[in-house]
């Protein structure tokens, strides 16, 4: 009779326990890049929203490789990144127990989409958040106190972070409540960081001031949820033989009689997906500009390249499936990223010093695919589709009726 072999390596990693639903929807930055005072003052992270995927064609610049100077097709993810608004500054002091908050200063004017984050039910609330606080900026005593806070932050703080929020009204999403996060300011002295942050209070910060072309970044987010799953799907254990009594997709032995407990390391059924994950080393292929009005005309050609001069936007025909149209600035990342469409993602500067040739390679895009992602798309633009299909019957009837 056939039987399975008696020894086998364990299935599934224990490094990600507990496999339960994430307590937060927005990816948390657990460590920021190391500060270098010799560099200019800059932010180290940004928030974006996953729109969807497409593919590009590029020429490889890797001397000595078989694919050098040849065209390759690469899958890419589009993350929409409208400008973030700075609404606060936080100063931290280093203590033997780690960083401790020293002072927090908020801006005078804070938008409703940011205030919504401080309420469970905005509709039923009195909407009074920050009404007393903003008066600090208006009377003389309050201004003196704020100046005192800023001077003490310059004197005692070692780390400066800004509080920034996303602009939900610019996105094709139903959610009105903005996502809020602390972003560490690196580079320069503490005084320079604080002055930089004060200048940008209530100002918009675009993504191209944080990241650059061809940069390697980390993506932090919550994965796509799969619900309650069995042990075979969740841990990828081997299915039992066909004639097994009471089921095949199970673990036959969950441990010895004593100790009279099931060990934590034994694969069991439970929650799969919606886990907090950090993926490192995602290369930026392109930082695209959103739609803009120039000389009274709407400019959309943010998917054109030096080789493909057709006037087209990054949006595929019909928009990104389950997302809509990307009208703001966007970041094009190599490969896939965690989460479902519309999921908020935290983009962070890399913690590592990049030395590999692949990381430092210059990306030269030849073509960006904009065919429909719903079915087998074959047309890059609506003009191309109309030219191929010819006039529609309804258009012809309307023309005849008009005549």
Curated annotation (Swiss-Prot):
Subcellular location, record wording: Nucleus, Nucleolus; Cytoplasm
Main location: nucleus
Residues found modified as N6-acetyllysine: 136, 286, 294, 366, 373
Region Disordered, annotated ranges: 1-37
InterPro entries: L3_arc_euk, Ribosomal_L3_dom_3_arc_sf, Ribosomal_uL3, Ribosomal_uL3_CS, Transl_B-barrel_sf
Annotated positions of the Phosphoserine modification: 13, 304
GO CC, alphabetical: cytosolic large ribosomal subunit; nucleolus
Modified residues (Tele-methylhistidine): 245
GO BP terms: translation
Cross-link Glycyl lysine isopeptide (Lys-Gly) (interchain with G-Cter in SUMO2), where in sequence: 39, 224, 226, 286, 366, 386, 393, 399
Keywords, comma-separated and alphabetical: Acetylation, Cytoplasm, Isopeptide bond, Methylation, Nucleus, Phosphoprotein, Ribonucleoprotein, Ribosomal protein, Ubl conjugation
Protein biosynthesis is among the record's keywords: no
Cross-link (Glycyl lysine isopeptide (Lys-Gly) (interchain with G-Cter in SUMO1)): 294
Keyword Phosphoprotein: yes
Basic residues bias spans: 18-31
Coiled coil: none
Post-translational modification: Constitutively monomethylated at His-245 by METTL18. Methylation at His-245 regulates translation elongation by slowing ribosome traversal on tyrosine codons: slower elongation provides enough time for proper folding of synthesized proteins and prevents cellular aggregation of tyrosine-rich proteins It is not required for incorporation of RPL3 into ribosomes.
GO terms assigned for molecular function: RNA binding; structural constituent of ribosome
Assembly: Component of the large ribosomal subunit. Interacts with DHX33.
Function field: Component of the large ribosomal subunit. The ribosome is a large ribonucleoprotein complex responsible for the synthesis of proteins in the cell.
Family membership: Belongs to the universal ribosomal protein uL3 family.
Protein name: Large ribosomal subunit protein uL3
Organism: Macaca fascicularis (Crab-eating macaque)
Gene: RPL3
């Amino acid at each position: 009779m056939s039987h399975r072999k008696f020894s086998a390596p364990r299935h599934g990693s224990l490094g990600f326990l507990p496999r339960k639903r994430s307590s937060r929807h927005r990816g948390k930055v657990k460590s920021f890049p190391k500060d270098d005072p010799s560099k200019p003052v800059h932010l180290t992270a940004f928030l974006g929203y996953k729109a969807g995927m497409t593919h590009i064609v590029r020429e490889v610049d890797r001397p000595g490789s078989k694919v050098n100077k040849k065209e390759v097709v690469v899958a890419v993810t589009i993350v929409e990144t409208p400008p973030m608004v700075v609404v606060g500054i936080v100063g931290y002091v280093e203590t033997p127990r780690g960083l401790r908050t020293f002072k927090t200063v908020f801006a005078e004017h804070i938008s409703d989409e940011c205030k919504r984050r401080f309420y469970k039910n905005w509709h039923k609330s009195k909407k009074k958040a920050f009404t007393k606080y903003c008066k600090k900026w208006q009377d003389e005593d309050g201004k003196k106190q704020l100046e005192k806070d800023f001077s003490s932050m310059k004197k005692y703080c070692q780390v400066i972070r800004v509080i920034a929020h996303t602009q939900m009204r610019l996105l094709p999403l139903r959610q009105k409540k903005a996502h809020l996060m602390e972003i560490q300011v690196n580079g320069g002295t503490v005084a320079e960081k604080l002055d930089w942050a004060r200048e940008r209070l209530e100002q918009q910060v675009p993504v191209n001031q944080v990241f650059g072309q061809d940069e390697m970044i980390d993506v932090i987010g919550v994965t796509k949820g799969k619900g309650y799953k069995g042990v075979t799907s969740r841990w990828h254990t081997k299915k039992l033989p066909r004639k097994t009594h009471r089921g095949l997709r199970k673990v036959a032995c969950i441990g010895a009689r004593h100790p009279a407990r099931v060990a934590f390391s034994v694969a069991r059924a439970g929650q799969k997906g919606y886990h907090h994950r950090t993926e490192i080393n995602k290369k930026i292929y392109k930082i695209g500009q959103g739609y803009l009005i120039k000389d009274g005309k709407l400019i959309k050609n943010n998917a054109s390249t030096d080789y493909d001069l057709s006037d087209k936007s990054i949006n595929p025909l019909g928009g990104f499936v389950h997302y809509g149209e990307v009208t703001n600035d966007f970041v094009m990342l190599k490969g896939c990223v965690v989460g479902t469409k519309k999921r908020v993602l935290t983009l962070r500067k890399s913690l590592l010093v990049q030395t590999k040739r692949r990381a430092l390679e210059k990306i030269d895009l030849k073509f960006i695919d904009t065919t429909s992602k719903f079915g087998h798309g074959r047309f890059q633009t609506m003009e191309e589709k109309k030219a191929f299909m010819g006039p529609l019957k309804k258009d012809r009837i309307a023309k005849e009726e008009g005549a």
